[in-house]
Structure formats: C-alpha cells, structure tokens
C-alpha cells in the first residue's frame, strides 16, 4: 500500500535522513503536498517530488488525497499541525525536533487517542543499527544491562531561530533518557539531576542525570526485575568557534555494562563489545539506515489493523521525566516518577 504524504517543515536532518529515505522507499510513500513557513522552501521541495505546495497547513491536511503527515519542524505554529491532523483524520509522524511542552503532554495524549489516528514519534537513537544489534546481543550473549553511561557534547550556541538553547538541551535529554530506557527494556523509576549555568547566561550549559530504570513493585518477580542504573551527561559549555575542542577525544555515545560483558556504541553503526572471549567489532554499514527504519516502521503502523499507542505513551513519559528532572534540580534530591 502506497501512502500519500503531506510534509510540514524541514528538519536539520532533512538532507541526510528524511529525503534519502523517502527516495529509497518510493514504493511505499509518495510526497503529494508540502507546507513550510518559508514559501520558497516549500516550492523547492515540492518541485523535487512533483508535489503541490500549500500556503497553509490546515488547507493541506484538509485535502482528501493526503493520508498522513510528516511533521518535521516546529515554527510559529507550534504543535497546531498535530491538532489539525487529528481533526482531519491523518496519521502523524512527529519528528524529533518538534517542541512538545511537558505541561501539555496529557492533553496531547487525549487528543490523539480520541481522534483514532496512528501516531509515531521519531526516536532515531532507538532504530540506529548499533542500538538494534545491541538489543540482540543483550538477549543472546551479553545478558541484562546493569549500568549505562551516556554522554552528549553540544556547541554552546546550540539554539536556532526556532529553538532556544534550553529547548535543545531538554530535547537531547529526553532522547537520551528514552535511549537508556529502550536499551535496558525498563521504564525510568527515579531521577536525580544536577546542573550548571555560567554567570553570564540564564540557560543551563551542563546537566547530569542519575536514573534508576525498573525496580518498581510491578517488576518484582520477573526475570528483568533488578534495577539498572544509568548516568547521563549533556553539556553545551564549549563555544561553537572551538570546533576542535568540541570533538576532541569524545567518549562513546553509550557504554553498557551487562551481566556477561561490556559494549561501546557510537551512532549510527559502530558497536564494539567484550566478553570472556575477548573483543568483538560489529560490521553494520550494510544495515538499513535510521531514516529507512523510521519510515518503514511508520508505514507499518499506519497500514496495520492493530493501533499501537506505545510511541505516544513514550512521548508523554519522556515529557514527564524532563519535568521531574527539573524538579530534582530545584529541590536537590532524587525524585520518583509515577508508573
């Protein structure tokens, strides 16, 4: 089944992720309509796909031939395209750059649930070849994760015209927390957060989170009942002009200590792991790239007879987690999440 898509906005990864994936999956998707707050960009992309540019996203979503929307970028309209897609019964692919306010998470969940549309959130780290292969190794060779370490280094001027530095930091933290939860196969049960901000800035330039994954009463008695500890650090303290310093001797994006071994990941394709037999290096370049994995999963969710709500629940859980992390920073203590 070929889906006719409406495209709203262009992400930072449009040229490297979404555009190549749409071309590779031309038998599953057809871009039929394009909206962008900058009309010249909409016209250019529409020409690439022989699609129709629109002056308004509601007008585009009201078009009867459009079956689903790729919502890739927030602009002046915020999350209004999600409301419009629900009004017109269009499936929603919600890109990782969309700004979703934590305090509106419950309203978003209720809106999508009542509309009955398919909803998929973009969690690119989950579907990177290295992440998927690690999950296989956890199930077959390495055993359950006991400790996870994640580090992300951003340039100090990491904001954009649409995003403030704090919003970028929050988005990174939500994605990193979700990544740890995905790898461990357990929800976050508690968070202890610390932060630092420079004297000449009102925004945080460093944040560290200590997470406990699992270990709740609901997990007791299961094979995966022991909690996993995750340590996340995300910093934007190096000026963008110091390009060499930003990338100097960065640690692996994720390190995982499992029952039977240790793994080091760098996205999208690098995975090195160790067990009693020694060092193993995975060759993952031939695997489907992240963009194709994401869009293939979206196509499956739209065409499936079974409606999946897990992505929406994960988005709401991530937004709740960032709120709890802020509270932990303010109160200087470990906070527990409602399960």
Predicted segments with their positions:
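N-terminal Rossmann-like dinucleotide-binding module
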Residues: 1-48
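Active-site loop of classical SDR/Rossmann-like NAD(P)-dependent oxidoreductases
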Residues: 13, 284-296, 313
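Conserved acidic residues
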Residues: 32, 67, 146
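Beta-loop-alpha module in the N-terminal Rossmann-like domain of NAD(P)-dependent dehydrogenases
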Residues: 38-40, 49-111
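C-terminal helix-rich "cap/oligomerization" subdomain common to oxidoreductases
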Residues: 46, 59, 68-71, 117, ...
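Hydrophobic residues in well-ordered beta-strands that form the structural core
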Residues: 55, 94-95, 119-121, 265
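A contiguous active-site-proximal alpha/beta segment in oxidoreductase catalytic domains
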Residues: 76, 100-160
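Contiguous beta-strand/loop segments that form the cofactor/metal-binding neighborhood of enzyme cores
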Residues: 171-268, 295-304
């Amino acid at each position: 089944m070929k889906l006719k898509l409406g495209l709203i906005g262009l992400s930072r990864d449009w040229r490297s992720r979404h555009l190549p994936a749409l071309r590779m999956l031309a038998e599953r998707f057809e871009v039929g309509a394009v909206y962008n707050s900058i009309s010249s960009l909409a016209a250019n992309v529409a020409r690439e796909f022989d699609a129709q540019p629109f002056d308004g996203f509601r007008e585009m979503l009201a078009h009867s031939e459009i079956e689903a929307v790729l919502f890739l970028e927030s602009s002046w309209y915020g999350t209004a395209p999600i409301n419009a897609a629900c009004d017109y019964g269009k499936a929603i692919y919600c890109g990782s750059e969309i700004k979703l306010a934590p305090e509106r998470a419950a309203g978003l969940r209720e809106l999508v649930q009542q509309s009955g549309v398919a909803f998929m959130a973009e969690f690119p780290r989950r579907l990177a070849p290295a992440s998927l292969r690690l999950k296989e190794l956890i199930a077959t060779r390495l055993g359950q994760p006991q400790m996870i370490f994640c580090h992300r280094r951003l340039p100090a001027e990491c904001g954009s015209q649409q995003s403030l530095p704090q919003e970028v930091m929050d988005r990174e933290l939500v994605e990193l927390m979700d990544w740890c939860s995905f790898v461990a196969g357990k929800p976050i049960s508690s968070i202890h957060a610390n932060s630092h901000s420079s004297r000449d800035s009102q925004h945080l330039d460093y944040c560290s989170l200590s997470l406990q994954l699992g270990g709740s009463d609901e997990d007791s008695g299961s094979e995966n009942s022991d909690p996993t500890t995750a340590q996340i650090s995300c910093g934007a303290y190096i000026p963008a002009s110091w390009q060499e310093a930003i990338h100097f001797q960065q640690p692996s994006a994720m390190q995982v200590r499992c029952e039977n071994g240790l793994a080091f990941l760098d996205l999208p394709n690098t995975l090195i792991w160790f067990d009693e037999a020694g060092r193993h290096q995975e060759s993952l370049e031939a695997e489907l790239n992240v963009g194709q994995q994401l869009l293939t999963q979206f196509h499956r969710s739209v065409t499936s007879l079974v409606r999946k709500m897990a992505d929406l629940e994960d988005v709401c859980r991530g937004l709740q987690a960032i709120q709890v992390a802020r509270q932990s920073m303010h109160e200087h203590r470990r906070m527990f999440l409602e399960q």
